[in-house]
Amino acid sequence: MTDVPPRHPPRDSGDAWVEGPDGRRFWGRYGAAGLLVHDPASGILLQHRAEWSHFGGTWGLPGGARHEGESAMAGAIREAGEEAGVPADALEIAFTSVLELGFWSYETVVTRALRPFQPSIGDTESLELRWVPLDEVDALPLHPGFGASWPQLRGRLGESHRIVVDAANVVGSRPDGWWKDRAGAAARLLRQVEALSAAGVDASEFGLSMGRTWPQFSVVLEGQARKGAPDGASTPREQSDGASSPGEQSDGASRSSVQNGVEPSMAALTPEVTVVRAEGSGDDAIVAEVARSTRIAPGDQATTIVVTADRELSDRVAAFGAEVRGPRWLLDLLDAVIRP
């Protein structure tokens, strides 16, 4: 969580102090962002701040001032790469948390480590970089900003959100001529879900506080719609009934690369969209997908939402603890992402 100017002249117009109406100063003309990397086996990656820096000697997150026009996610990834050698391709985004003061903001970008890596000091802002077990974080002298946010951040590290989409039900809820080309309609829905997966979902949709979260999406296709697939280079991960469970990546699975306001390099950090092509009943495939999700991520912090208006299916998935939202809920989220 770097909020101090470098010792050399500013490299970007964002490298400047902002002063609030109460006289407090914060680093970053366009706001600032920090990266929290969580590895269940190692803990979280922390930066021991150089003594000459603001709140020097404390521990916080790699990060710093955002550049003009730069998203918080891009800024956090860039700063963590520069300061700590964090490889972007080793990360998957989980959620963001925002401190908004009106005249300045700080966004914490929380990610999961997909593979082990060793950080490396890249500039003079760090005395040390260390993986710290969760239970040992509070024993360190923490940067005041990070210390204030850590209890809430820690409480969310174990959360898991999955959205299972009844594609036939969602497509059929919008009279746009889908019946003329079921496969084409399914392909359009998949592209839209990929865009939403890349952009993330407002945390309030899951009853959480400010920020965004990146759920795992599974889209279940049946009948003629099973032929549907997005055009272009981007292809969601696919599985048929009985294939590997969501979260178990198969060889050759590719990550989504979606525009719609999301930088291509940032889209690579988002969870993959899983396409389930039902061999038989689509409802049975959805129930099986929900059951797999429950086994993969059990517990109070695991949320599974099934998008359907089918009452019988709703009752079946509710037996596994899944929530049910109607197609309109998902369509509103999709429209918000793809609208110019």
Predicted regions, residues:
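Entry beta-strands of beta-propeller and related beta-repeat scaffolds
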Residues: 43-44
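Nuclease catalytic cores that cleave nucleic-acid phosphodiester bonds
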Residues: 159-165, 169-241, 246-340
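Short, basic and Ser/Thr-rich N-terminal targeting/leader segments
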Residues: 29-32, 105, 213-215
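Short histidine-centered catalytic/ligand-binding loop motif
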Residues: 60-69, 177-179
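Acidic, metal-coordinating catalytic segment for phosphate/diphosphate chemistry
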Residues: 2-36
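Unchanged
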Residues: 65-158
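A conserved beta-turn-beta hairpin within the catalytic core of GNAT-like acetyltransferases
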Residues: 53-57
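Anionic group-transfer/hydrolysis microenvironments
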Residues: 36, 50, 135, 168, ...
